[in-house]
Amino acid sequence: MIIEMFDKVLLKTGETAYIVEIYEQGVAYEADIDKADGTVETDTIKHTDIEKKIILYD
């Protein structure tokens, strides 16, 4: 799966995140992660942390 800037993704933890930086395609990204308590945490995620890309529009 190809991940692009600002894609919304579902993480394997069940959280959603927006990609804000691509460090290396298919390897690592910086993401704004929507936490269960309503906060947003910016963190580095691996491609293997991503369950699927969420399509916002066609």
Where does each model-flagged region fall?
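Basic/aromatic-rich interaction segments and small domains that mediate binding to polyanionic partners
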Residues: I2-E51, L56-Y57
